[in-house]
UniProtKB/Swiss-Prot annotation:
UniProt lineage: Bacteria, Pseudomonadati, Pseudomonadota, Gammaproteobacteria, Enterobacterales
GO CC list: cytoplasm
Official protein name in the record: Amino-acid acetyltransferase
Record carries keyword Cytoplasm: yes
Signal sequence region: none
Pathway(s) per entry: Amino-acid biosynthesis; L-arginine biosynthesis; N(2)-acetyl-L-ornithine from L-glutamate: step 1/4
Location within or outside the cell: Cytoplasm
UniProt-listed CDD domains: AAK_NAGS-ABP (cd04237), NAT_SF (cd04301)
Organism: Salmonella typhimurium (strain LT2 / SGSC1412 / ATCC 700720)
Cross-referenced PROSITE patterns: GNAT
Length: 443
């Protein structure tokens, strides 16, 4: 029997290996809202969490129980009470909260413990640990309203949690915590997850929502937000009356977490099978990241970037789109190059060759990785190169191109005669390539 070759599997594995190495030994806090737990895809999410654990990632799983609590209250004819969009947990409600949270804890523990069954890792034991790792305190009274048993975190025993993580356990934490006086309090899962991520110096905080992430006005996924942008989105959603959706709750926590040192917070869909793995083990992910520092950077190239630039431009050189450059030439001209990097991979580059006497510059060797050509990376490079040219006192910018004539025309370049090139460039013009000359005023 001839076995079918799975090229996609091979390529996917090659791309994921660097992330496996990067994530090993790091601490991730995963926030599972009650909506995610109710969904049919939850068993797949649990399996993927088990897979992360098997790869050596230290995991703290925080679960919420909002819809389960509401259902339990309704079943006992107990009307939920809210003040300023926060649940008021009276004595009767607290018992129903504890009941819902306790059942979820047992269910999630059982699922995580057997999450690697029916996989090649069957037989590997996963130890799931819960405990009194958080101390709660009451929210108190606000505008004359007593929140009763609704509380907030007073402190976290991060040393005890780290000991469990060091021992290879998954730490599972729910929405009920006790105070120093032994009283129980109902906490929000987003507050628990956020404070845990900060205290444990987690690499990532991950949350789930019904959509694939944060969407723009056209319904497309926004792949990356800075905290101020995420905060603006929270305020926008709240203005529309959305105070407690999974997206809003997670974004509130993500803003605080990022500003307190958590490098990346990820919001993904609980409805999409494999979204957790796609987000963590691919270059572009599948959801929305909230980050203090972008995964993508534009900067001047250094000698260490030569390998990445060569890998990017070689296919274009072989197709005749770019003029071939040797490694030696690239080493001598590396200070002319600007690159865009994403997760340490060079995805775009361009060079600026100034002709100072003529006050004109050439933008050359413009290349964008095929996966990113539908985005705005080319425009970002053009803006950066134009800014560099202005700083040098140059007044015009020209390009020689055989394939991208319309792209440059759409961005203010106009075709000109070869005679308008600087004298030294004119002498080097390759009449066999017959490249078109386009020029723009830098203004």
């Amino acid at each position: 029997m001839i076995k079918e070759r799975k090229t996609e599997l091979v390529e996917g594995f090659r791309h994921s290996v660097p992330y496996i190495n990067t994530h090993r030994g790091k601490t991730f806090v995963i926030m599972l809202g009650g909506e995610a737990i109710e969904h049919d895809n939850f068993s797949s999410i649990v399996s993927d969490i088990g897979l992360l654990h098997s790869l050596g990632i230290r995991l703290v799983v925080v679960y919420g129980a909002r819809p389960q609590i509401d259902a339990n209250l309704a079943a006992h004819h107990h009307e939920p009470i809210y003040h300023k969009n926060t649940r008021v947990t009276d004595a009767k409600a607290l018992e129903l909260v504890k009941q819902a949270a306790g059942l979820l804890q047992l269910d999630i523990t059982a699922r995580l413990s057997m999450s690697l069954n029916n996989t090649p890792l069957q037989g590997a034991h996963i130890n799931v640990v819960s405990g009194n790792f958080t101390i709660a305190q009451p929210l108190g009274v606000d505008d004359g309203v007593d929140y009763c048993h609704s509380g907030r975190i007073r402190r976290i025993d991060e040393d005890a949690i780290n000991r469990q993580l060091d021992n290879g356990a998954i730490v599972l934490m729910g929405p009920v915590a006790v105070s120093v006086t032994g009283e129980s309090f109902n906490l929000t899962s987003e507050e628990i997850a956020t404070q845990l991520a900060v205290k444990l110096k987690a690499e990532k905080m991950i949350g789930f929502c019904s959509s694939q992430g944060v969407t723009n006005s056209e319904g497309g996924i926004i792949s990356e937000l800075f905290p101020n942008e995420a905060q603006a989105r929270v305020e926008e959603l709240e203005a529309q009356g959305d105070y407690n959706s999974g997206t809003v709750r997670f974004l509130r926590g993500a803003v605080k977490a990022c500003r307190s040192g958590v490098r990346r917070c990820h919001l993904i869909s609980y409805q999409e099978d494999g979204s957790l793995l796609q987000e963590l083990f691919s270059r572009d992910g599948i959801g929305t990241q909230i980050v203090m520092e972008s995964a993508e950077q534009i900067r001047r190239a250094t000698i260490n970037d030569i390998g990445g630039i060569l890998e990017l431009i070689r296919p274009l050189e072989q197709q005749g789109i770019l003029v071939r450059r040797s490694r030696e030439q690239l080493e001598m001209e590396i200070d002319k190059f600007t690159i865009i990097q994403r997760d340490n991979m060079t995805i775009a580059c361009a060079a600026l060759y100034p002709f100072v006497e003529e006050k004109i510059g050439e933008m050359a060797c413009v290349a964008v990785h095929p996966d990113y050509r539908s985005s705005s990376r080319g425009e970002v490079l053009l803006e950066r190169v134009a800014a560099q040219a202005r700083q040098m006192g140059l007044r015009k910018l020209f390009v020689l191109t055989t394939r991208s004539i319309h792209w440059f025309q759409e961005r203010g370049f106009t075709p000109v005669d070869i005679e308008l090139l600087p004298e030294s460039k004119k002498k080097m013009y390759n009449y066999q390539r017959r490249s078109k000359v386009l020029m723009a005023d830098l203004g």
